[in-house]
Amino acid sequence: MTTDPAQAPTRARSQHQRRKRIVQAAAALASRGGVEAMQMRTVAERAGVALGTLYRYFPSKMDLVVAVVSEEMDLLEGSMERRPPGSSTPASRAVELLMRATRGLMREPELADALIRSLLLSDVKTNFGSRMTGMLLRVASEGEATDGQRTLVGALNSVWVMEMIEILRGHATPEETHERLDVAAQRLLADF
């Protein structure tokens, strides 16, 4: 059985659209009831795919959570490219990006909580930290970043993750988080 090479782009587009529907269905369920609401059978039904198809794309629920996080990161990167942080200092540009991410996540607090909890408790390797660090480096550094700068920006990213946890637990407001991120960024990125 041979396949027509002319059909390959159509098949790839169809697979991409199917994957996108699955991720969107999972995100919608998580935003209403956390990761617990992301039952694989329910995700498959909402996405209009067979359960076996869902498992072919995402062998576990955690793989699906990682895909949802990746989609959120794509949205943040797109936002940053369309509207780069305009602040005058590296520290304030980094904080502007982190607060943009915070506002984006807090539009769907159930989803944010589900994603952060799952990532913290998961054994699945993700590139979330390195992607966020990369975005922070792009807005904060001028030119090629040094290893020391990568370490400092990674530390700022870790502060932000903890601040997100505090917001989600109801122990901090976005305003308090903004203040603390300002202080941390000013100190960590002082030599950028």
Task: Please state what every model-predicted region is.
Residues 1-33, 37-46, 63-66:
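Basic, helix-initiating cap at the start of DNA-binding domains
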Residues 30, 65-72, 119, 128:
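Alpha-helical DNA-contacting segments of helix-turn-helix folds
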Residues 39, 112-116, 176:
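Short, hydrophobic secondary-structure boundary micro-motifs
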Residues 48-58:
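Short hydrophobic/aromatic patch on the recognition helix
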Residues 67, 78-107:
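Hydrophobic alpha-helical connector segments
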Residues 77, 96, 119-165, 175-189:
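Amphipathic alpha-helical packing segments from all-alpha helical-bundle domains
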Residues 82, 114-122:
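Short linear capping/connector segments at secondary-structure termini
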